[in-house]
Amino acid sequence: MEIENKKPTILLMHGSGLSHIVWSLHEQFYTSQGFNVLSIDLPGHGNSDGPSLKSIEDISNWVKKLMEKVKVSKISLVGHSQGCLVGIDFASRYPDLIDKLVLVAGSYKMPVNQDLIDLAEAGDEKALLLMMKWGYEGSKAFIGGNPVKKIINSTREIREILAVDLNACNNYKDGKESLEKINCPTLCIFGD
């Protein structure tokens, strides 16, 4: 992707076990509105190489390095679920690099049920089914009504991606303190 420095840049950060696919329509819309859009896959996710990053802080540092690589000086970060934790951490640690923050369906702390972590670490598809049930129950607005099979495709991905992400969320303890340090405009979007 070529970045046009005169345009503002939006970074779209997916949630646990997911990839840039979840932002496809948003990416098209924001691009058509004149924004640079970085719809990323975290390491180990989607089309990205390397192992999954094991902590929210590691992901924040990776985002900073990505910005340096693509020569972007400031971003508006839109984070979903785990991406909210990354957004909170990033905005508190790198205030000069963030213009705006949008948090979608997340919180400053995300304790994860140990049974769910255990299922993911075992590569059990039930971990995915439970997440989709809790997060999207009743929704048919996804790929063929079934987001699970199109986003995460194997038990290896459940073990090596989803389990790592769930542990990163569960182990992030600096959320409240980080939230208090944020000084950029922030929009929180939550449902019931």
Identify the role of each PLM range.
Residues 13-15, 80, 190-191:
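The conserved beta1-alpha1 loop
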Residues 85-129:
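Flexible "cap/lid" loop of the alpha/beta hydrolase fold
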Residues 2-49:
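Conserved HGGG/HGGXW glycine-rich cap/lid loop of the alpha/beta-hydrolase fold
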Residues 42-45, 106, 169:
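Active-site loop/turn elements of alpha/beta-hydrolase fold enzymes
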Residues 118-183:
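Conserved alpha/beta-hydrolase catalytic His-Asp/Glu region
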Residues 41, 76, 99-102, 180:
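Residue in the alpha/beta-hydrolase core beta-strand immediately N-terminal to the catalytic nucleophile
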